[in-house]
């Protein structure tokens, strides 16, 4: 259970960082 929870937590962090970087690049390109 702990391994699955930590895995999903890590996956959530990666998705959040990727989304933040993608949005940042999009804003830079729009400006």
Swiss-Prot record:
The keyword Thylakoid applies. It holds the Pfam family PetL. Its main location: plastid. GO terms for cellular component: chloroplast thylakoid membrane; cytochrome b6f complex. The 4 large subunits of the cytochrome b6-f complex are cytochrome b6, subunit IV (17 kDa polypeptide, PetD), cytochrome f and the Rieske protein, while the 4 small subunits are PetG, PetL, PetM and PetN. The complex functions as a dimer. PANTHER family: CYTOCHROME B6-F COMPLEX SUBUNIT 6. This is Cytochrome b6-f complex subunit 6. It comes from Jasminum nudiflorum (Winter jasmine). The gene is petL.
